[in-house]
A protein has these predicted regions:
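N-terminal beta-strand block that forms a small beta-sandwich/beta-barrel module immediately after a flexible targeting
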Residues: 1-40, 89, 142, 146
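Hydrophobic core residues within well-ordered beta-strands of beta-rich domains
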Residues: 22, 139-141, 157, 178
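Surface-exposed patches in structured soluble domains
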Residues: 27, 45-66, 78-115, 135, ...
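Short, solvent-exposed secondary-structure boundary/capping segments
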Residues: 35-37, 95, 151-162
Length: 180
């Protein structure tokens, strides 16, 4: 009677598959293959800046208007892909020079940079599925290991295992810590 009240059950032991799991920690990062630095095609003066950090942009939308130093004609600097403006180094009236004026990141997929200790290196392979959980356990999703670093960090004595994660709702924000 006490066993039933405690919710304890009895079952017959038999053959089953054992799955080894590994607990890792990491951070969300933009998918570097979906990040673009945007510079002026021709040197000139920024006449207007149309976007700020955090703005969503579609491919081809205006980021700024520049007056060319050579032709004195204005041209529009456009977003090379749809995403979010993550950096801006442009203000109206400034010379463009050769610097990057904007960074645009498509966050529909993100990378999870997991810290992998050398003793665990043999347990992680490209192609494996990884369950990613937010630190507060509010979010959970499965991704695939797409890269395991062939070299480690002297500062942390770890290697990077990279998981690609679909992020259609933009709920996995770069910079946040996660568990895997």
């Amino acid at each position: 009677e006490q066993i039933q009240a405690a919710g304890i059950g009895v079952a017959t032991a038999g053959p089953a598959a054992i799955r080894e799991t590994l607990s890792l920690y990491g951070v969300i990062a933009p998918n570097a293959e979906r990040v673009r630095e945007v510079s002026a095609r021709f040197p000139g003066v920024l006449r207007s800046v149309d976007r700020k950090i955090g703005d969503a942009v579609k491919q081809g939308e205006a980021l700024a208007t520049i007056e060319s130093n050579e032709s004195l004609q204005t041209y529009t600097l456009t977003a090379p892909l749809g995403g979010v403006v993550t950096q801006r180094s442009a203000n109206a009236g400034e010379q463009t020079g050769e610097k990057s004026l904007f960074t645009v990141a498509d966050l529909s997929t993100v990378w999870v940079e997991l810290s992998l200790f050398p003793r665990d290196l043999a347990k992680v392979r490209v192609g494996q599925t990884a369950r990613i959980r937010s630190v507060d356990a509010g979010l959970s999703a499965d991704g695939r290991v797409v890269y395991v670093a062939p070299f480690g960090s002297t500062a942390t004595q770890t290697l990077v295992a990279r998981v690609q994660l679909d992020n259609p709702d933009r709920r996995w924000a770069p910079g946040l810590y996660v568990n895997a």
